[in-house]
């Protein structure tokens, strides 16, 4: 069973997302014909899927691999340099090269950024192997590496040629990674009331990993993101900002833990709860709404407990570095109801007061 949808960005060529019930890498062959191919993956995914992927490629391709360490802390300049050096050492040229990102969000982000900057832009293909990367980071063209002072601070908007993925990857995906991915899925439920209702009615099947339901879940998640990206690919109008619900708080959590604590999806889960509480603090939603929204998050196995190893001062400083901020104004994606999120400006003092009473 295959589900296919199209992403139509504002400024970039359209491309397809292919969601498969089985794992058939032959779907990407048309995109690598007569190409030099560099497969970028990590040590974990390489052991599971690299051999199968390489076996699916035709014999006359010039194929190289670049295997990075696994973890958010390796989404770094050093890892980027390793990819670029591999390209240069093997004389990969702009018009004949395609990068393949075989892995989760870290691999997709860093490979996409390498593709964006190598010789001013080369083709790349996304093969996301985690739920989170399937529904979020592989779609929409955001590519980046982290800096010691902040997450995703060095990057570019750069779209892939195609996204191919399969729910078969879940067979080797740790449960913690699956639940982390569900946080990004639940985020879309707050953006779309129809999806909120669909998730609510299919919760048991999702948690049981029913194949047909999961394909539909991934497809619907990608459709929501694709619709937003089509309106505001490069975050010029503010429409795309709603995709960052939970991320202002979440990114600060990751930064404070040096990207070695909560996984990205876990941090987003906590971040959404923080954004919900902040919305209640500001009078945008009632106490009962805040409880209901947080209960919905938790019902999918997602923890919303704030880490106890983060001090408020450090957390506040990390939030001040958020990319949405401008002219010393803090910007947050806040919620007024299911399907009603908005980008709002708040003062540093307002945030400090909220943090004082919420700890």
Curated annotation (Swiss-Prot):
Binds 1 divalent metal cation per subunit. Can use either Co(2+) or Zn(2+). One of its GO terms (molecular function) is nucleotide binding. The keyword Metal-binding applies. Zn(2+) binds at residues 184, 247, 264. It is an enzyme of class 4 (lyase). It catalyses: 7-phospho-2-dehydro-3-deoxy-D-arabino-heptonate = 3-dehydroquinate + phosphate. Its cofactor is Co(2+); Zn(2+); NAD(+). GO terms for biological process: amino acid biosynthetic process; aromatic amino acid family biosynthetic process; chorismate biosynthetic process. Belongs to the sugar phosphate cyclases superfamily. Dehydroquinate synthase family. HAMAP family: DHQ_synthase. This is 3-dehydroquinate synthase. The lineage of its organism: Bacteria, Pseudomonadati, Pseudomonadota, Gammaproteobacteria, Thiotrichales.
């Amino acid at each position: 069973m295959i589900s296919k949808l199209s992403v139509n960005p504002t400024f970039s060529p359209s491309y397809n997302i292919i969601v498969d019930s089985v794992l058939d890498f032959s779907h990407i062959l048309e995109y690598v014909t007569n190409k030099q191919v560099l497969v970028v993956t990590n040590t974990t995914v390489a052991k599971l899927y690299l051999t199968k992927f390489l076996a699916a490629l035709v014999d006359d391709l010039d194929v190289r691999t670049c295997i990075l360490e696994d973890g958010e802390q390796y989404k770094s300049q050093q890892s980027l340099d390793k990819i670029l050096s591999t390209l240069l050492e093997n004389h990969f040229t702009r018009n004949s090269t395609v990068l393949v990102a075989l892995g989760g969000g870290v691999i997709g982000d860093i490979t996409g950024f390498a593709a964006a900057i190598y010789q001013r832009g080369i083709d790349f293909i996304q093969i996301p192997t985690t739920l989170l990367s399937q529904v979020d980071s592989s779609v929409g063209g955001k590519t980046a590496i982290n800096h010691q002072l902040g997450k995703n601070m060095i990057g570019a908007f750069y779209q892939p040629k195609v996204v191919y993925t399969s729910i078969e990857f879940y067979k080797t995906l740790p449960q913690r990674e699956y639940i982390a991915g569900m946080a990004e899925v639940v985020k879309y439920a707050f953006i779309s009331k129809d999806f909120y209702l669909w998730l609510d009615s299919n919760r048991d099947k999702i948690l049981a990993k029913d194949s047909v339901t999961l394909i539909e879940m991934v497809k619907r998640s990608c459709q929501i993101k694709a619709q937003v990206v089509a309106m505001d690919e490069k975050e010029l109008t503010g429409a795309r900002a709603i995709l960052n619900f939970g991320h202002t708080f979440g990114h600060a959590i990751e930064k404070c833990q040096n990207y070695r604590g909560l996984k990205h999806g876990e941090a987003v889960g906590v971040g959404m709860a923080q954004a919900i509480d902040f919305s209640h603090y500001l009078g945008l939603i009632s106490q009962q709404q805040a409880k209901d929204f947080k209960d919905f998050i938790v019902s999918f196995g997602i923890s919303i407990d704030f880490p106890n190893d983060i001090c408020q001062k450090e957390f506040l400083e990390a939030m001040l570095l958020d990319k949405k901020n401008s002219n010393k104004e803090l910007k947050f994606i806040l919620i007024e109801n299911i399907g009603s999120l908005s980008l709002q400006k708040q003062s540093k003092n307002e945030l400090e007061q909220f943090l004082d009473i919420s700890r």
